[in-house]
Amino acid sequence: MCDKEFMWALKNGDLDEVKDYVAKGEDVNRTLEGGRKPLHYAADCGQLEILEFLLLKGADINAPDKHHITPLLSAVYEGHVSCVKLLLSKGADKTVKGPDGLTALEATDNQAIKALLQ
């Protein structure tokens, strides 16, 4: 399967395409080109429905990417409040520190995200 096409679907919110890849055997925990997992790409781009689907299919909510960034940190860094809320509700570890040594709470100035993390 082509990583670039799968990554495009993850980033652009093409849920039907993501479902098709998974139905054909795509591992939701596989490290893709670029050193990140599917959940990271969805979190980075604010793709809430895709996050929900990947988690339902067993994606590791706390898996770090090649930079030691978790999906929660990805969503926090990009300011995706709804994704942060979903990840926390599904058990994401908010104490993990990113490569800068900061937790998600310490890494954001977004007040809505801070409120979720406290």
From Swiss-Prot:
Any GO molecular function: sequence-specific DNA binding
Any one GO cellular component localisation term in the record: F-actin capping protein complex
Coarse class of the protein's main subcellular location: cytoplasm
Top-rank taxon: Eukaryota
Phosphothreonine modification, residue list: 31
Gene Ontology biological process: catecholamine metabolic process; cellular response to mechanical stimulus; cerebellar granule cell differentiation; neuron differentiation; positive regulation of cardiac muscle hypertrophy; positive regulation of cell growth; positive regulation of macromolecule biosynthetic process; positive regulation of NF-kappaB transcription factor activity
SMART domains (alphabetical): ANK
Cytoplasm in keyword set: yes
Annotated positions of the N6-acetyllysine modification: 4, 11, 24
Ranges of the ANK repeats in the UniProt entry: 2-30, 34-66, 67-99
Coiled coil location: none
InterPro entries: Ankyrin_rpt, Ankyrin_rpt-contain_sf
Phenotype upon changing residue 33 to A: Reduced interaction with RELA. Reduced translocation to the nucleus. Reduced activation of NF-kappa-B transcription factor activity
Keywords in alphabetical order: Acetylation, ANK repeat, Cytoplasm, Nucleus, Phosphoprotein, Repeat
Disulphide-bonded residues: none
SUPFAM superfamilies hit by this protein: Ankyrin repeat (SSF48403)
Subcellular location per the Swiss-Prot or TrEMBL entry: Cytoplasm; Nucleus; Cytoplasm, Perinuclear region
Residues with N-acetylcysteine modification: 2
Family: Belongs to the myotrophin family.
Function statement: Plays a role in the regulation of the growth of actin filaments. Inhibits the activity of the F-actin-capping protein complex formed by the CAPZA1 and CAPZB heterodimer. Promotes dimerization of NF-kappa-B subunits and regulates NF-kappa-B transcription factor activity. Promotes growth of cardiomyocytes, but not cardiomyocyte proliferation. Promotes cardiac muscle hypertrophy.
Summary of subunit composition and partner proteins: Interacts with the heterodimer formed by CAPZA1 and CAPZB. Interacts with RELA.
Protein name: Myotrophin
Gene assigned in the entry: Mtpn
